[in-house]
Regions:
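Intrinsically disordered, low-complexity N-terminal segments enriched in charged residues and glycine
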Residues: 1-96
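Conserved P-loop/Walker A NTP-binding site and adjacent catalytic elements of P-loop NTPases
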Residues: 93, 98-173
Length: 173
């Protein structure tokens, strides 16, 4: 993103705001707050070109990290399970709605396939896909199963957190 010194036009500010909405989830709040602070300073006549340039660099960095996460999504293979027959429909619903409730028989693949369906529609690129389990052993078992299906090692794209035990990395989805 190119921000020219001394020219913080409404169009450039609008571009910054738009780009912030595309950043990593964990960065959005802080970037928006920093932009608001800079705009407030600008209204008070305390223009600081260097701070606008630094903000633009932070936004670019966050966008690059998000692109790297997108590029690191492993190849997704869906085994022959009942939920796999409806994966396109479920993916479309996940893309269109903030909340989707999926009901199915035990063993239909909900637990292991829904996170992969979420990955297939780009979820997990701006932040983590959370998957809760009622017991510690279940959390480890589910994570191991998904890792096995993706052909990776624990902690790469898939990890788990149980109390103080963290098996995730920066690039975990």
């Amino acid at each position: 993103m190119v921000i020219t010194k001394g020219a913080h036009s409404q169009a450039q500010i609008k571009k910054l705001k738009k780009k912030i909405t595309l950043c990593l989830s964990r960065d959005r709040f802080f970037l928006k707050r920093e932009l608001d602070r800079l705009l407030n300073e600008q209204r008070q006549g305390k223009m600081n070109d260097e701070k606008f340039l630094q903000l633009a660099d932070k936004i670019t960095y966050s966008l690059q990290k998000k692109e790297n996460r997108q590029a690191s999504i492993p190849t997704l293979v869906f085994p022959d399970l009942p939920i796999s027959e409806r994966k396109d429909e479920i993916a479309q619903l996940i893309s269109a709605h903030q909340v989707v409730i999926v009901c199915g028989e035990t063993g239909s693949g909900k637990t292991t396939q829904l996170p992969k369906i979420c990955l297939s529609v780009g979820r997990g690129c701006a932040g983590f896909i959370g998957h809760t389990q009622p017991r510690r052993i279940a959390a480890r078992t589910v994570a191991n199963r998904i890792v096995e299906e993706l052909g990776e090692t624990m902690g790469q794209s898939v990890g788990y957190k149980i109390r103080f035990h963290d098996k995730t990395q920066e690039r975990s989805l």
